[in-house]
């Protein structure tokens, strides 16, 4: 929206399009509307960007994946950066981002050890999720480390006098965003320390669902 407000060339395009429409030749004719139902000449796919044909669907997925890899390669090359920092939760989004990062490093002839992957367990992190994160990082051969964010989260919750610190089981949005914010803060400070870029793990599905909390994990990634 801000880009549209700053850029004023869109009005020029509208005017040009209007003039082009005026120059089109118009041919009038009469057409009798049939009373019977008209069958469609071709089936219209319910999900046009996700083909029913498995081979075509795989082709589309590979293309989208290569766009991600190429975009990361371009950013690393442009900024002359050889390391990335990424938070790995054990879920699907961060797993996909981590795999894309490994392929970008391979194509740039950089060691996968330059991917600094961190799992940052919080109050609700399960052993299964944490183990999945460790197994994935080990399988991909990246530099991995675990940082428990609970102490720093607890300090912030105490600072803001959140009822959780008094023993009340209040798991509200403040409780959740303290953890998201701590994770993001850790990752950016680690990137500063190691002269790296933070690789976001958010995706368009999160954006479509409204998961873009300002200032913390979703918005920053």
State each model region's role.
Residues 89-101, 128-131, 160-162, 213-216:
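Short glycine/threonine-rich loop-to-helix capping motif typified by GTGT followed
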Residues 79, 86-89, 95, 118-121, ...:
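Generic beta-strand/beta-sheet core signal
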Residues 1-6, 138-143, 218-221:
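C-terminal, active-site-flanking charged/polar segments
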Residues 100-108, 136, 219:
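A glycine- and small-aliphatic-rich helix-loop capping segment at beta-alpha/alpha-beta transitions
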Residues 105, 140, 163-221:
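Active-site adenylate/phosphate-handling loop in enzymes that bind or generate adenylated species
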Residues 21, 28-45, 110, 114-174, ...:
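A conserved beta-strand->alpha-helix junction
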Residues 1-87, 102-113:
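RNA-binding accessory domains that recognize and position tRNA/RNA substrates
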């Amino acid at each position: 929206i801000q880009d549209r407000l700053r850029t004023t060339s869109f009005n020029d395009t509208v005017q040009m399009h209007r003039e082009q429409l005026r120059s089109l030749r118009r041919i009038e004719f009469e057409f009798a509307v049939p009373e019977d139902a008209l069958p469609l000449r071709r089936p219209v796919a319910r999900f046009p960007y996700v083909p029913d044909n498995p081979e075509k669907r795989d082709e589309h997925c590979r293309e989208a994946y290569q766009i991600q890899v190429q975009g990361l390669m371009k950013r690393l090359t442009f900024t002359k950066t050889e390391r990335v920092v990424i938070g790995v939760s054990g879920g699907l989004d961060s797993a996909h981002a981590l795999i894309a990062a490994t392929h970008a490093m391979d194509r740039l002839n950089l060691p996968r050890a330059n991917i600094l992957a961190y799992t940052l367990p919080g109050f609700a992190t399960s052993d299964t999720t944490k183990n999945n994160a460790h197994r994935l990082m080990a399988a991909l051969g990246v530099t991995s480390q675990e940082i428990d964010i609970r102490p720093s989260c607890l300090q912030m919750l105490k600072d803001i006098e959140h009822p959780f610190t008094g023993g009340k089981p209040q798991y509200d949005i403040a409780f959740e965003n303290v953890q998201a914010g701590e994770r993001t803060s850790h990752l950016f400070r680690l990137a500063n320390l190691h002269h790296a870029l933070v690789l976001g793990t958010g995706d368009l599905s999160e954006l479509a669902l409204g998961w873009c909390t300002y200032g913390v994990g979703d918005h920053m990634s």
